[in-house]
């Protein structure tokens, strides 16, 4: 007879961030326990790792220390950098334990807008787990009082509405946009650049960003003008906590935040009716994809790869992924989640949750480059300068950001050019 040790479960480490609030950590802990109890082969140890940026740092540190995590919920725009630096496994290393290639699974089962961020140079390195786009949250009760009939469809309408909603005597603001350098600022800024008709980065080549461009200058000027010229938004760097607090206390008309915050926004909008709409357009309607994907770090054993595959397929199964979507407000990247009876009932009961899906036809990949975090912060830190000071010009800000980003990407660019690029 086999001893107990021979029948022991394969143990794997699973790192996950909770970008919204403490409830997500509790829910993920429940999902892990449910998986562990459901089968005899795998024992998953969940490790909560803070936000997206710290999750990347902790996963890389664990790998360097010889304890690579078998599975990590990683910000979807980190896949490129991790793959180029040879830190993560191509997903086929896990999918060889199943009956199809990772790329086929990705293309068949997931919304097309998710594909680009999951693949690097044609190889699938990630499987989407939960996704978001920025959306416009608005206080419908305040809209009604101000005589605003529908959410703004264009930047001009957004500004006109924000003016009607601003009341300095009450400390009430028309709109707030997050401008923090934790990816929120850059994400929302990229949405404005795209809506203004521009491209934010080269989607096919990780060594190019387009910070110093007319569309980026225009988006930055629009943002700065909302504060200093139109006076419909407070000055300084605003974080998502400040914005949601102002919104819940009835002191804010509109906010551009993630669909991933829908559950949180719904729960806390108690004294008024919460409205949700697509982001307004300027030259075009456009939003970036956000959220996170599952990646697997190099250095794990074959047994751990097999175990990781089992847990991964569980996490993205229509039932589990759909339930996570309903709990959080992130949309499920797995198309079949929306065929489940629970999801159909949920969308019927709260149509606001369908906005992110409707926006998918206007979605584009999340910016991802070589050294993506530092390259992102180059622009975000200039965004901070612009919102902090009316005298900082958008032109100077994008020039400084471009210079810093180019210097950061230079090693990759030189390697591609086969020579030093001056």
Feature locations, PLM:
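Short, well-ordered beta-strand elements
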Residues: 9-20, 42-47, 71, 173
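Extracytoplasmic "Venus flytrap"
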Residues: 12-30, 49-50, 132, 183, ...
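Extracytoplasmic "Venus flytrap"/periplasmic binding protein-like
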Residues: 30-109, 141-153, 246, 253-254, ...
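Extracytoplasmic/periplasmic substrate-recognition and gating elements
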Residues: 38, 146, 217, 221, ...
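Hinge/lid segment of periplasmic solute-binding proteins
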Residues: 76-133, 185-188, 275-277, 344-345, ...
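Short, solvent-exposed loop/beta-turn-alpha elements that line the ligand-binding surface or hinge
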Residues: 92-109, 179-180, 196-218, 267-269, ...
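Long, aromatic- and glycine/proline-rich binding clefts that accommodate carbohydrate-like moieties
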Residues: 106-109, 270, 274-277, 326-381, ...
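Glycine-centered hinge/linker elements that transmit conformational signals in sensory
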Residues: 161-163, 168, 205-236
